[in-house]
C-alpha cells in the first residue's frame, strides 16, 4: 500500500499512539486522547485517504467537532494541525491544508479575582482553615498549584527568608490504548512548567511563620504511634505524609467562599490578587493590604 492510500482515521490513531504520545506529558495525552477519540473520530462521517484531504474536508470536519462543546473547535484544530504537520513531514502528502482551515480561537480564560474588601473577608476566614499556609503561598508568592504541592521543607531558607521553586506535583495517568479511559492514576514529581519557573523567591515573615508551624505539626505526626507517617518532606501533605489530591485545594477554596458568601475563587485566582486596570501589571498582595503585621 502506498503512503497516500492510508486512511486518515487509521493514520490518526496510529500517529497518536505511536508518534505523538511518546513525546508528550501524560496530562497532555489525556486531553489529546479525549480530543481524538471523543471529538474528532466520532465526527468523521466519512473517512478519507490522506491523498484526498483538502481544506474543505477539514473545515467540514472541524465544524461538526466545534458543535460538541465550546472548546472543541480549538482543541480539534490544534491536534489536527500537529498531526497534519507530521503527515507532511513524513511525505504522506505533498501539501498540508491545515494552515488554510478556519481558525477556532481559544476562549479567553476567566479568572475570578476578589476585590480588596472581599479579599479581606476571605483571608480572615482562611486564617482559621487548615489550608491557610497553601493559600498564603498562592497569594503572597504567586505559586502555581503544582508548585505549592511540590514544596518541601528543604526548599525554605529560614535565615535568608527565601524559598526555592524546583519541582511541581502533577497527575500521572495511564490511558487504555485507543480509548479515553484512565486505567491508572498517581501524583508524581515533575520539573517546573518552564525554565523560567525555576526561581528563588523572597518570602514574607507571615508566610515563614506558617511554614514553621506546619513543620512543627508534621514533626508531631511523625511521633504519633497511631499514624504510619511516610516522610517525603512535603510541606503540603495528608496526615500520613502522602501527597494531597490535586483537586483538594480548589475544593477547600470553594468551601471557604461558600461559607462566607464570596464568589468562588480557584488556586489560579489566588495568583492574581490585584491588577492595574491600565497597565495590567501585577501588584503584590502587600501593595494592596500593607505589611504582614496588618494581616490576620
Where are these regions (language model features)?
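N-terminal core-binding DNA-recognition domain of tyrosine site-specific recombinases/integrases
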Residues: 4, 16-92, 108, 243-248, ...
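Short, structural beta-strand-to-alpha-helix junction motif
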Residues: 6-11, 47-49, 152
Amino acid at each position: 500500500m502506498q503512503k497516500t492510500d492510508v486512511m486518515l482515521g487509521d493514520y490518526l490513531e496510529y500517529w497518536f499512539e505511536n508518534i505523538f504520545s511518546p513525546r508528550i506529558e501524560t496530562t497532555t495525552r489525556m486531553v489529546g486522547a479525549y480530543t481524538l477519540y471523543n471529538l474528532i473520530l466520532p465526527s468523521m462521517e466519512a473517512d478519507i485517504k490522506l491523498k484526498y484531504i483538502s481544506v474543505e474536508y477539514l473545515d467540514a470536519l472541524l465544524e461538526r467537532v466545534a458543535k460538541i462543546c465550546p472548546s472543541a473547535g480549538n482543541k480539534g484544530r490544534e491536534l489536527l494541525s500537529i498531526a497534519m504537520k507530521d503527515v507532511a513531514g513524513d511525505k504522506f502528502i505533498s501539501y498540508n491544508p491545515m494552515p488554510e482551515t478556519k481558525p477556532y480561537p481559544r476562549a479567553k480564560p476567566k479568572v475570578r479575582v476578589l476585590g480588596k474588601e472581599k479579599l479581606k473577608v476571605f483571608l480572615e476566614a482562611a486564617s482559621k482553615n487548615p489550608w491557610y499556609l497553601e493559600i498564603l503561598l498562592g497569594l503572597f508568592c504567586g505559586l502555581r498549584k503544582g508548585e505549592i504541592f511540590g514544596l518541601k521543607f528543604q526548599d525554605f531558607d529560614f535565615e535568608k527568608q527565601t524559598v526555592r521553586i524546583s519541582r511541581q506535583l502533577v497527575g500521572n495517568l495511564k490511558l487504555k490504548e485507543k480509548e479515553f479511559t484512565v486505567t491508572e492514576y498517581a501524583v508524581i514529581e515533575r520539573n517546573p512548567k518552564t525554565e523560567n519557573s525555576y526561581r528563588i523567591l523572597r518570602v514574607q515573615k507571615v508566610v515563614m511563620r506558617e511554614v514553621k508551624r506546619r513543620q512543627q505539626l508534621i514533626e508531631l505526626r511523625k511521633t504519633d504511634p497511631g499514624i504510619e507517617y511516610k516522610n517525603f518532606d512535603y510541606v503540603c501533605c495528608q496526615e500520613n505524609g502522602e501527597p494531597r489530591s490535586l483537586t483538594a485545594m480548589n475544593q477547600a477554596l470553594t468551601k471557604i467562599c461558600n461559607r462566607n458568601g464570596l464568589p468562588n475563587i480557584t488556586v489560579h485566582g489566588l495568583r492574581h490578587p490585584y491588577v492595574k486596570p491600565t497597565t495590567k501589571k501585577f501588584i503584590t498582595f502587600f501593595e494592596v493590604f500593607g505589611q504582614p503585621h496588618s494581616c490576620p
